Curated annotation (Swiss-Prot):
Belongs to the chemokine-like factor family. GO terms for cellular component: cytoplasm; cytoplasmic vesicle; cytosol; extracellular space; nuclear membrane. The chain crosses the membrane at residues 64-84, 96-116, 131-151. It is found in: Membrane. Residues 1-12, 175-184 have a biased composition (Acidic residues). One of its GO terms (biological process) is chemotaxis. Keywords: Chemotaxis, Cytokine, Membrane, Transmembrane, Transmembrane helix. This is CKLF-like MARVEL transmembrane domain-containing protein 3. It is a multi-pass membrane protein. GO terms for molecular function: cytokine activity. The keyword Transmembrane applies.
């Protein structure tokens, strides 16, 4: 445990290299699982972070840096949520409402990207601004798809919870009405 031993035990595999069936631990443990990256949520988060980074680079190259903060912030948030979902931090930190945070992140990103993309395309004639505006529109679409899917999942979850409460409430009412009729 901690503190580490002065002399760690020798690894029997170190002389021969790792076995064919086992992976080498280390920085690979921080990489997201392939199954998550191939899922719809993983692909959306990868697209969000990629488009945010490209938009950020386009604004860096352009002459004014008024819109530089939004793509950088959204890139960092998308990478954070990608890492959090891949490492299943939402299961470990139950106190945070992860779907609501992700939903608010996507809604605000879609709205802000839409506004700055319209401004960049309409107001500036620089090619980097035009490219940033186009990538911003693509990012708006990806963020909108993500918040639509999150909204549907949350609505389905809440609907299932309400139907479960209604059936137990209905059963309780039936039991109370049956017990009242028996006592008369």
């Amino acid at each position: 445990m901690w503190p580490p031993d002065a002399e760690p035990e020798p690894d029997p595999e170190s002389a021969h290299g790792p076995r064919s069936g086992r992976t080498v631990p280390g920085l690979r443990a921080l990489l997201p699982a392939r199954a998550f990256l191939c899922s719809l949520k993983g692909r959306l988060l990868l697209a969000e972070s990629g488009l945010s980074f490209i938009t950020f680079i386009c604004y860096v190259v352009s002459s004014a840096s008024a819109f530089l903060t939004v793509p950088l912030l959204e890139f960092l948030l998308a990478v954070y949520f990608l890492f959090a979902d891949a490492m299943q931090l939402n299961d470990k930190w139950q106190g945070l409402c992860w779907p609501m945070m992700d939903f608010l992140r996507c809604v605000t990103a879609a709205l802000i990207y839409f506004v700055i993309s319209i401004t960049a395309v309409a107001k500036y004639s620089d090619g980097a601004y035009k490219a940033a505006g186009v990538f911003g529109f693509f990012a708006t679409i990806v963020f909108a798809i993500d918040f639509y899917l999150i909204f549907n999942e949350v609505a389905k979850f809440l609907k299932q919870g309400d139907s479960g409460n209604e059936t137990t409430a209905h059963r309780t009412e039936e039991e109370n009405s049956n017990s009242d009729s028996d006592s008369d």
